[in-house]
Amino acid sequence: MSNQGAFDGAANVESGSRVFVYEVVGMRQNEETDQTNYPIRKSGSVFIRVPYNRMNQEMQRITRLGGKIVTIQTVSALQQLNGRTTIATVTDASSEIAKSEGNGKATPVKTDSGAKAFAKPPAEEQLKKKDNKGNTMTQAKAKHADVPVNLYRPNAPFIGKVISNEPLVKEGGIGIVQHIKFDLTGGNLKYIEGQSIGIIPPGVDKNGKPEKLRLYSIASTRHGDDVDDKTISLCVRQLEYKHPESGETVYGVCSTYLTHIEPGSEVKITGPVGKEMLLPDDPEANVIMLATGTGIAPMRTYLWRMFKDAERAANPEYQFKGFSWLVFGVPTTPNILYKEELEEIQQKYPDNFRLTYAISREQKNPQGGRMYIQDRVAEHADELWQLIKNQKTHTYICGLRGMEEGIDAALSAAAAKEGVTWSDYQKDLKKAGRWHVETY
């Protein structure tokens, strides 16, 4: 069977059905591709034709095969001739790998003149056509001139005192994660939701120099957990990994210091820093939050500011009336950090807050594998896309960097159903200050 035949079989749809072409790079050799009879590409892009009703399934399959969707374009009825597109080189998703080599960039497959029909229109043109109100996204980034930054520097840190250090992982969970609250009285360490602070651990490094600071996302609102403007809190996981050569277990210096610190201990604090993850001032904004593990820290600050009674009383100028949606990825149920808080908010504000878990070691994705956050995003991609199109919507991503590719693939598929190229649309979201990412 030829590659072209495999391609046609994958796109066997009725005349007039909507069809899309995925440009894919980076699919790798694995058990599934080992079972095929087709050659594996070593470089360049693979073009895969997908019917509308299989877009999400194909996107998930491509992600499972290690591929990354670069573009998704529509195929009009005029571009389909006897069920064939005019793209010269195409293949079935499970039969080829397009892994970029050398400079790490994709090398496009040569196409004939018909491929010009798939050229991406300017981003602003797409937004004009596809914005839900028919307007371009002209919202400017929020002015951050009044945001406090670097009030305390490494050479003159603030000395805070530990008030409490409480475990967040329940029995049967994986790893150590602590909620640590510090006393800020006697200083001028002001901060707002979405910022980070630096912690300088005691001691010296292997070169005999003082330990360098580590940054941690703040887990409390500007008013602190007690809503008295006197504290700041962190959500810290003890870093633990195997040394690649010796195989010994290695623990992070600063994370171990913090997760085991005793109340009453003094800690060197710097900052605050960061303007990327700030919550919009508009109380009618919509907020999408995608988090894994301790990436919940800034999301907790947003949710407290939006929904906690004491916070709402302390912020009469900000009474949240929008819609927020948290998709939270964790390995097990005992690893759902702040579970009681989250579910209390969901129960109290069902019309304004939606909570979705992705529990990788307990739940299965549609392919039978582990349910990661990107799988949940794919499951709800159409709903999320409709929300993202609203000019009042801000999206926040915090946690493991590995989730970004799957999230982009899911939203690419959803956007393509309306003829929008996600990568271009995302760039405009960033320019408008509506796409916020803090991953590691």
UniProtKB/Swiss-Prot annotation:
Residues 99-142 are annotated as: Disordered. Keywords: Antenna complex, FAD, Flavoprotein, Membrane, NADP, Oxidoreductase, Phycobilisome, Thylakoid. Transmembrane segments: none annotated. SUPFAM superfamilies: Ferredoxin reductase-like, C-terminal NADP-linked domain (SSF52343), Riboflavin synthase domain-like (SSF63380). Residues 155-279 form the FAD-binding FR-type domain. It is a peripheral membrane protein. This is Ferredoxin--NADP reductase. GO terms for biological process: electron transport chain. NCBIfam families: FNRPetHCyano (NF045929).
